[in-house]
Regions:
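Short, structured segments at the rim of ligand-binding sites
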Residues: 1-220
């Protein structure tokens, strides 16, 4: 006998990738940041990677506190992505950006998605010393002040764009990120949330989009 469907209620889980992105942003800028709500069990792998890089991470019942390294410098560490509960592939580009500012060599191994290394080219344009060993492996030669102001880079995909945004926060000066709409697919008001904790971010229309909109508005 067919049964009728009934209504129900469900609480959406906090986004571990958004929380991890903010945690990495705090770490790369040497900032103290409290994130909540989070599910601690979902953040263990990201927290462990940050701890190996010298960052203090305190996971509470529903919170994550990120504290800058006591030494004032990030340490190199190796990471390899894996399905949950391993290190998330969707945080690999952001962590690569962070490791570019650590003092020493790190190796990043992408074991989930083939070819997820395109962000390395754009990070190199910002001054990072990243060498692509193959389409799954990056060798990062970190230097604390390697990222230069004035770069104009492009977000080729969602998480690669987040990596560029995280890296730009560590730059003393302006960085232009084109095609930032990629980030809107995976983050809700990312620029506004970062501004709320002190980031200087301005979203401006690209000339191509402005010209296209103007042409549409002038069409009879």
């Amino acid at each position: 006998m067919q049964q009728a469907l009934a209504g129900g209620a469900w609480t959406v889980l906090p986004d571990r990738i958004e929380a991890g992105t903010f945690a990495i942003a705090a770490a790369i800028t040497g900032s103290r940041l409290l994130l909540q709500p989070v599910v601690p069990g979902h953040m263990q792998a990201a927290a462990e990677a940050l701890r190996r890089s010298g960052v203090e991470v305190d996971l509470g019942a529903a919170s994550m506190l990120v504290i800058p390294p006591r030494t004032g410098r990030l340490a190199p560490t190796d990471i390899q992505t894996a399905p949950h509960p391993g290190f998330p592939t969707d945080l690999q580009p952001q962590m690569t950006a962070l490791l570019a500012t650590a003092a020493g060599r790190s190796t990043v191994r992408e074991a989930v998605f083939d070819g997820r290394v395109r962000h390395a080219q754009e990070l190199r344009a910002m001054g990072a010393d990243i060498r692509t060993a193959d389409n799954r492996t990056l060798h990062v030669w970190g230097r604390p002040s390697c990222l230069r102001p004035g770069a104009c880079v492009a977000a080729r995909d969602l998480r690669g764009g987040a990596a560029l945004l995280v890296a730009s926060l560590a730059v003393e000066g302006a960085t232009t990120i084109q095609e930032c709409w990629h980030m809107d697919r995976g983050y809700e008001q990312l620029d506004n949330k970062l501004r709320a904790v002190g980031a200087d971010i301005q979203r401006v229309p690209s000339p191509a989009i402005t010209a296209a909109a103007s042409a549409c508005n002038n069409t009879d």
